[in-house]
Amino acid sequence: MPSSKKNPTLDDVSKTIIELLQEDGRRSYSDIGRAVGLSEAAVRQRVQRLTDAGIMQIVAVTDPMQLGFRRQAMIGIRVSGDTRVVAEEIAAIQAIDYVVITVGAFDILAEVVCEDDEDLLALINDSIRPIDGVLSTETFIYAKLQKQLYNWGTR
């Protein structure tokens, strides 16, 4: 969810709506309205504006292991040339769900969820390494997910 604006200004009501949805994405608009002093319709409109602006998403977060995906990994990618172009190509790969351009040992980090090790190897060898500009990859296989939260607040 790349942001379209650099620093959108949110009022306290919008921030509270976001925080309430971070706690429970299924919370009703009428419940949120009671908490922030707005009507259900006003909350619905604010949520729609926040999602349309790319400020937030409301999604179901699944446990990949429960769905049959046995391998999760972060792939560090070193690049020559325009990192943004390579990152766009990597982001277009369906099996990759998270791509960031970084400053440090790797130019790009990509998070993947695969069915098994064979699927992971195929993804790296057939989809990532052939991209023009990819110099090398290093894969960090997740042994155990210790913590994953999405409630970092709104400042």
Language model segments and positions:
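A compositional/biophysical signature of low hydrophobicity enriched in polar/charged and small residues
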Residues: 1-155
